[in-house]
Regions:
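Active-site-adjacent structural elements that line small-molecule/cofactor binding pockets in enzymes
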Residues: 1-192
Length: 192
């Protein structure tokens, strides 16, 4: 259940944001959409949308649409999830989570910028797709929706390398399982 009365009270009290999540049941986007439709000024973010569950273009289209419909109140929170959920629930290879994060956010930023048709040649993603069973008909495309390049993108991390990755490509980070009393474990990564 979505605790809408508590969310509305948080909005009335001036809270800045509320966040939705997903694992292997309810998805974060539907809940975020519901909250955005029932509120007027609190920002709503996903903490997190699992990257292996969606293509970067699908995540970008979703984020652009929610950001536009909400008057700029949507925050895109992404994460690589974990191998148990990625391979067990989504049925795709876990691969290289930091590489996926860099590629995924790079593609989304290209889509939001709309400077040119999007191309990407990476470990996890090829745009246009040229791999096995490709028809050869795919061509680089540019979003027909004008997204906001300033749309905030956050990413989750469970390691110091993940914090470094977030600092490179994201606007914020969710330091999952970070013990505030052991901030020193991440301090060097944050300073880079």
């Amino acid at each position: 259940n979505v605790p809408m009365q508590q969310i509305l009270e948080a909005e009335r009290l001036g809270y800045d944001s509320v966040w939705t999540s997903e694992a292997y049941g309810s998805d974060a986007v539907s809940v975020a959409s519901w909250i955005l439709a029932r509120t007027t000024h609190i920002r709503v973010g996903t903490a997190i949308m699992q990257m292996p569950a969606r293509t970067p273009t699908c995540a970008a289209m979703t984020a652009m649409t929610l950001h536009a419909l909400s008057g700029g109140r949507f925050i895109l929170g992404l994460g690589p999830s974990g191998p148990q959920v990625v391979e067990g629930w989504h049925g795709v290879a876990y691969g290289r989570p930091l590489t996926r994060t860099r590629e995924y956010i790079s593609i989304i930023r290209k889509i939001l910028a709309r400077k040119e048709p999007v191309t990407h040649d990476g470990y996890h993603y090829q745009m246009p797709y040229r791999g096995k069973d490709a028809t050869g008909l795919g061509k680089p495309l540019k979003s027909i929706l004008h997204g906001d390049p300033a749309l905030p993108i956050y990413t989750a991390s469970i390691s110091s390398k993940g914090i470094e990755c977030a600092a490179e490509v994201a606007d914020g980070v969710f330091p999952v399982w970070m013990n505030p009393e052991r901030f020193d474990l991440f301090e060097e990564s944050l300073e880079r």
